[in-house]
Amino acid sequence: MKVMFIPSRAVPFNPERVQGGLEAVHLNVLKYLVSIGADIDYIGFDNDTFGDWKVNHHPVGHLTKFSLGMSYTMARKIVELAGINEYDFVVTMEPTKLTVQAIKDAGLSKVHKNFMATPFEPVSRGIVQIWDQTIQIHKNGGKSYAPTKAFREFERKYCYMTSGLTDKIDYDYWRANPLFEAEDYPVICLNDKPEVLPATDLIISAQRYDTKMRRTDVALEAIKALGENGAGYCPSKWAPPAKYPVIIDAPHSEIMERLKMAKALINTCPDTGTVENSSIEAISKGVPVIQLVFKDYPHATFEYDPDTVRVEIDSSTPKKEVVALYTKAVLEFTDTYEARVKRAEAVWKKYNRDAVVAMWDKIFTA
């Protein structure tokens, strides 16, 4: 299988530094393709790190902040490589307009596989552009994939959300055409059945600092209230104010080692159907999530653990009340070892290696 792989543009690739949901998607797709021995042309950056993963690396510069110049260079590289290779698939994660156009110019739209993880937010210019390009990919004959049933359900609501920034979106086309394929992509691959450990008193937060979509300030207020029984992790690119004592840029392996002994994981992203990477990893180890969620909303977390604790709010709930409600739920949370085992077993059944390979195989033969 010959694949052109065009990464998410936020950070250079490093399998030990997964900084968010989109980077986790990136990691999981690439891991599958490497595992089946695909011949991968990876259009990335000078500071990508692959370890022993075998790819043909085509860097377009050193990434500190993604620039328009890099986008043009990437577009030229797509067309150049397409001129000398035959590709079975082109893989993207929420590509730019220039990338989508270059894929079309190269005659590769029909083999374009795009993986989504960012919820629609009509007042965010960057997110509006991402979804506008997802519509364009569909128009061009490419295919886009969602991580969960909840995300696909939200997509049918997103197509009625507008703002002053969405005037270029073709809503008539979008409302008439669901953008995602019926098959969800796997969000994790478990090579070995996780050992379920008894819980300590530790409760962890492991999400970037974002007070709007992720409500991380609510999470870190709960961590503060826990004292020595709370631990917050953030990447330096999205670090919180100094008043929050968090651990910055810890290796992914270090976070996972502590997580498997945690009493619970905090998740304060209340209204998305996407996957918070640490949440699925926690549940796979039997560790429950304490989920902040808007009333009557679906959430990806509930697809993996239907017994997840829901802390329900609505969009008009004052922040002080949200903090109080969530912190109370965190401080009063209890669980059992039997529940941890049940939680982990359900995720293992769905995402063991054989099941995941079958899911990817289905996507990459469609």
Regions found by a protein language model. Name each.
Residues 186-214, 220-224:
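Conserved donor-binding/catalytic core segment of Leloir-type glycosyltransferases
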Residues 210-214, 269-279, 291-302:
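Nucleotide-sugar-dependent
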Residues 89-91, 104-139, 143-145, 161:
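Active-site proximal beta-strand in glycosyltransferases
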Residues 1-19, 204-207:
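Nucleotide-activated donor-dependent transferases that construct or modify glycoconjugates
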Residues 10-14, 31-69, 236-239:
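N-terminal strand-loop element at the rim of the active site
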Residues 260-274, 287:
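Acidic donor-binding loop of glycosyltransferase active sites
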Residues 316-324, 334-365:
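A charged, aromatic-enriched C-terminal amphipathic alpha-helix characteristic of glycosyltransferases
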Residues 92-97:
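Short His-centered aromatic/hydrophobic patch
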